[in-house]
Amino acid sequence: MDQMLSPNFSIPSIGTPLHQMEADQQIVANPVYHPPAVSQPDSLMPAPGSSSVQHQQQQQQSDASGGSGLFGHEPSLPLAHKQMQSYQPSASYQQQQQQQQLQSQAPGGGGSTPQSMMQPQTPQSMMAHMMPMSERSVGGSGAGGGGDALSNIHQTMGPSTPMTPATPGSADPGIVPQLQNIVSTVNLCCKLDLKKIALHARNAEYNPKRFAAVIMRIREPRTTALIFSSGKMVCTGAKSEDDSRLAARKYARIIQKLGFPAKFLDFKIQNMVGSCDVKFPIRLEGLVLTHCNFSSYEPELFPGLIYRMVRPRIVLLIFVSGKVVLTGAKVRQEIYDAFDKIFPILKKFKKQS
């Protein structure tokens, strides 16, 4: 055995490993951090004898000799990494960025790009996404592009106008009830001699056995008045509120000319009657069965269906031909509101021809 081994070979002891540790398994007491080399183009590589090359060589030597390891001080970095300076972008760079932003906002553009996302948000740039395509193309570029776009928006949209009130959706806009009669009352505040009025006034009649009031008529406005001995007067037949008041004043003037101290107090409209035509026949039998709580229909007594509306408090006379009479209103709007509510109900009971 000793003859087979070389004279310089010695058998290791039990505690000595047979194999040496590999290079990647060895623990270095003070490792040195070497930054990765960055490949640079040939045009950017410094000359061999330049000062930058010498500076890098000195830096590497100092890193290899001095304790700037992982467990000691931080590794020294190149000077370019230590000092960072900020420079204002040039005018050409700003123009290039603005052109890229406008191209991204154009109709054929591909939306937002990283360059456009890095640009500061201004009111003009924020409104550019809200403008229609036609106005973006007309808006122009540069500093005045935002103002031109805003002016184009105002020109396209036109001046702002007050919103018109919406018409009732239930009623047909082509059907509007027309006022047929207005009944009003007034107090003359004096006792009247009805025989004297009937003898001296024109177009007046008085028959106490039939009716205890003087019936007087005038042509303009075409109305009829009922004059009582207590001084109360009822005016009927006017087509509007103003005509009813004018007619009542004319009757009071006639009484004054006959020698009575008549006044004109407490004028009030008591009833308004309107009518309209829905232009289609109506199944009154089905309507009275469905709305039995509000309507009554006795064709043997009266050919129309009587519909008593609760709100507004209006009474409607509905006929099979489609004619509708509305009565009991104090103001004109109540007639319009009642018709707007009854019209969709009548459409449900339209006769199928």
Swiss-Prot record:
Belongs to the TFIID complex which is composed of TATA binding protein (Tbp) and a number of TBP-associated factors (Tafs). Binds DNA as monomer. Interacts with TFIIA-L heterotrimer. Interacts with Taf1, Taf2, Taf5 and Taf12. It holds the Pfam family TBP. Keywords: DNA-binding, Nucleus, Repeat, Transcription. Transmembrane segments: none annotated. Residues 49-65, 85-106 have a biased composition (Low complexity). GO terms for cellular component: nucleus; transcription factor TFIID complex; transcription factor TFIIIB complex. Coiled coil: none annotated. One of its GO terms (molecular function) is general transcription initiation factor binding. Belongs to the TBP family. The keyword Lipid metabolism does not apply. Its main location: nucleus. The keyword Nucleus applies. Residues 20-121 are annotated as: Disordered. This is TATA-box-binding protein. Sequence repeats lie at residues 179-255, 269-346. CDD domains: TBP_eukaryotes. General transcription factor that functions at the core of the DNA-binding multiprotein factor TFIID. Binding of TFIID to the TATA box is the initial transcriptional step of the pre-initiation complex (PIC), playing a role in the activation of eukaryotic genes transcribed by RNA polymerase II. It comes from the Eukaryota. It is found in: Nucleus. PROSITE patterns: TFIID. GO terms for biological process: DNA-templated transcription initiation; mRNA transcription by RNA polymerase II; RNA polymerase II preinitiation complex assembly; snRNA transcription by RNA polymerase II; snRNA transcription by RNA polymerase III; transcription by RNA polymerase II; transcription by RNA polymerase III; transcription initiation at RNA polymerase II promoter. The gene is Tbp.
